Structure formats: structure tokens, C-alpha cells
Swiss-Prot record:
Keywords: Isomerase, tRNA processing
Chemical reaction(s) catalysed: uridine(13) in tRNA = pseudouridine(13) in tRNA
The organism's place on the tree of life at top rank: Bacteria
Name of the protein in question: tRNA pseudouridine synthase D
Record bears the keyword Lyase: no
InterPro entries membership: PsdUridine_synth_cat_dom_sf, PsdUridine_synth_TruD, PsdUridine_synth_TruD_CS, PsdUridine_synth_TruD_insert, TruD_catalytic, TruD_insert_sf, TruD_pseudoU_synthase
Protein role: Responsible for synthesis of pseudouridine from uracil-13 in transfer RNAs.
Pfam families recorded: TruD
NCBIfam families: PRK00984.1-2
Taxonomic source organism: Pseudomonas putida (strain GB-1)
GO biological process terms held by the UniProt record: tRNA pseudouridine synthesis
Protein family according to the UniProt entry: Belongs to the pseudouridine synthase TruD family.
Amino acid sequence: MTELELLGPRASGEPLGTAVLKAVAEDFQVDEVLDIPLSGQGEHLWLWVEKRDLNTEEAARRLARAAGVPVRSISYAGLKDRQALTRQWFSLHLPGKADPDLSRAEDASLRVLKQVRHLRKLQRGAHSANGFTLRLTALAADHQALDTRLEQLKQNGVPNYFGTQRFGHGGGNVHDALEWAARKALPEQRNVRSRLLSAGRSFLFNQLLAARVADGSWARAQVGDLLAFTDSRSFFPAGEAECADPRLAILDLHPTGPMWGEGASPAGAATAQLENAVGARQPALCQWLAQAGMDHERRILRLPIGGLTWHYPEPDILQLEFVLPAGCFATVVVREVVDLVSAGQTDSPCVF
């Protein structure tokens, strides 16, 4: 499956040129934002860890081995890219135990930067945001046009697509999810099951968002929509008055789309018709998600880009810095600006 099939159309027009992302790990830096005051005491040891070209799950296994505890005793808030330089929190459950020597887990790809005790473990999804520093190299685009486009994105946000990372190489996770859905079965392995359910659900959301980008309604509230604030999981229906709420214009409040699961969508009017039409194209997948116990949830259609700044360290390098809510993808910001090409191959798209 192509990127266009997995995501959907761009909202800002054609890309302004090409660039390379992730030529080296330092070109894609992620810092987890966690707004939890740590007490300094308790049976959970929280670790602030820097990883280079190492995925979150492998880092967790290495930390658990070094601490001499089962991997189920280690927790993290979210998964981070492997091909990147990332800093994120982990927690180890160590009731009645002293702080372990974690030096055996450390090498060029993993460093423990800080250790703090706390009363509770780190919960999945506990982080509020991720801060990104991206260096786009081999840049072939006009700086003035880039500045204009980036100012536009700063003011308007971008479609909140799930990035291609969610779907595996060539959309392989979506293909697998569709096959399992057709058989009305679930993989036995928990991590495989979770990955495929997530991919199938994300694919359906992107299909809905693609339709609203195509008709221009992705950033505009309409009667029947369900609205949500940027950092809230709750939502409320939009009538005429809600569609005129000034918080929509300042990117605090947004229309939402469905994360398919058990139960009907509470949306109304044209919004409900479109959501039902998208679901009707993949009935087996929708039923599979519901039968797997997934609840119907909502995700904002528009992604506000917090604190977006940029500069050009060299004429052919664009450096971007910004903050995104947890669960959102930096690459969907970049695709609204330039086409990404792989290092050493300037004529073929890069898949992350």
C-alpha cells in the first residue's frame, strides 16, 4: 500500500521540494514530556533513558535483565521510534529492593540519565506530549516558500493522520489485520494482537480523515460533529452555537473522528453519514475491532503544532522544533512541507 492509501491527501498543497530525514539518529530527536512530580520514595524506580537506534521494547528488555527482574516489572508511557535519538521514562517495580546496578544495560545505544523513586508505576499513555527536534538534510526547496508554508502550518495545524510507522512496511500490518478480520479470529500473541488491532483502527480513522481533508471540512466544525479539546479524551456534540465557538479558531477545540470499536458513533447529521459510509467499506474490520473488545473512542482531526520554530543551519538543512500531543506523528507535519527521500536515494520515497 502506498503512503496516499495509508494516510490520505495533504491539506496544504503539493510538497515544496525534497529532503532526507533520519540520515543519522541525531536528525530525529524526541523528548517525552511527562507532567508528573516524582516523590523521591516508593517501590518504583523511575528511569530517564536516552536511546539511540533502539526501540522502546528492546530497551525495556535490557533494563529488566540488568535489574534482574522479569520484563513485566518494567513500564513505559509510550513507544518511540527506533531510528532516532529519543529520551523517555521507564519505571521498574522493585518492592523491598535496593536500586540495581544498571550499567550492564548501557552502551552506545542506551544511557540511563536519571533515577528517581516514586510511589506508583508509570502508566501507558501517561505522558502529555512529545518534543521533537528534526533536521531535514539534502534540502531541495525554496526557503521563502518554506517559510510561508511553515507559518501557515503554525496557524492552521495539519491533518492528524496516523503516520506510516503505525502500519508497517508497505502497510503490512493493515494487510494482516484485514486477513485476521476476514477469519473472525485474533492472534494469540498479545503484542501481535495489539499491533494489528491498532493498525486496523488507525487505518479506518485515516480513511475518515482523508475524506474530510478532501472536502475541506477537517479543520471546520459542522453540526453533528463531536468536538474535543486538544488534550482531552472527552467530547461533546456540535450544534450551531458550538460551531461558532472562538476556541476553534485558536486551535484549542477541534472536530473529531471515530476510533472504531464497540457501540455506534454518537455523531449526527452529515458527520454520522460519512462515518457510517467509511465503516461500510470495511464491515469485517469494524466488527473485528468491536468483537476484540475495543471501545468506540474519538481522536481530534486537526493537529495543532506547539511552539513551532525553524531555521537553516546550512542552505541545504532545515531544522524544525515543535511539540505534539501524545500519540501524534511528527512525520505527518513534515509531509505537509516536503517529500521525504531516503539517504543515498534521491528518487525514491522513504518509509518510516
